[in-house]
Amino acid sequence: MKIKRIRTFPITLQVRPDLYIVSSAGAHPVSKYVIVAIETDEGATGWGEASVVPLWSGETQGGAMALINDYFAPMLLDQRVDDYEELIKKVDGMLDNHFTKAAVEMALLDLVGKRRNCPVFEIIGGAKNPLEIPIKFSIGLREPRDTANIAAQKVREGFTAIKIKVGPDPEKDLRRVEAVREAIGPGVRLNVDVNGGWSAEQAIREIRRYEKFNLEYVEQPTPRWDIEGMAKVRKESGARIMADESVFTIWQAREVIAKQAADLISIYPGKNGGILKARKICELAESAGIVCHLGSNLEWDIGTAAMCHLAAACPNVRADRYPVDILGPLYYASHPAVDPICFRTGRVSVPTQAGLGVRISVPEIEALRDGREVTARSIFR
């Protein structure tokens, strides 16, 4: 099976107005993707997805498409799909561009799974976790009452964990967290995500003010580059700390571990440049006694499927203890995948079909690119 054609599709999806995310890193009312289709001489197609947010990774739709079409495609055309590991190494020769490289890797692994007639999680080590994964719901910087109402509704729907964005307005942040804790009760897991919006000194002060709300952990309290500051926050506040933006690469993970800056590390295929590299970070963290968690960049169905396979194959992803952020499709009204990812009662189902397990309709992808309406399909079953 050889690669014969590679296509890219720029897609823009509106986030549901009642749920779009605002954080210390900015607003996220619209999601931009690049969908990758790798086609073979045997008629198979592998699908990948890059969720590009310049404020997050520095990548853009135009840049991702240029990199794939002008650089990666010439490397991959006429190559054997079975040589996917070597092909991924070639793609990794380009610096940075983590989400773009992850999209190409997803498409290759999707093809390998289809060729072997097995799900991707079997290719990367087999299922080490249950195929029904506990997830949490994330709420942006909204008014305290609105945030509390959304959180209470999600708990009624079956979520057992809630994440709240905080950072730019300490007093309103405090009221927001207080309102949510009151609305969801003491038995629901609650954490806050600062998205690097605090200095180390401010983080220590604010975390102490949050002690009465029984937070499970604080995510990325300091800027991504300030790993020493995050270590100071962890030591002086006594809070459990999760590193997210600070860990794009395995070298950054090593630094976080060496400086004892985090109790948990957030991984996911896009941020880490692919499923395989995210798994390596997970294995490194496990050797250091640090649990891994899956974060999110509001992925669509393809990227969400990749996250599911990673979570299933990594025993150090303890979603039973720390429900994960596999939640992107919940934030969109339209789901043009033929068989969308299935969510139910605060859980997501890992696809078990061959490859990533998400079938894509090219006409519907084209319709989204052109900005036309696409028939919505329910993702709840």
Region roles according to the model:
Residues 74, 208, 214, 225-242, ...:
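Shared catalytic-loop signature of beta/alpha-barrel
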Residues 46-48, 133-139, 162-164, 188-194, ...:
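Hydrophobic faces of well-ordered beta-strands that scaffold small-molecule active sites
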Residues 331-381:
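C-terminal extensions of enzymes
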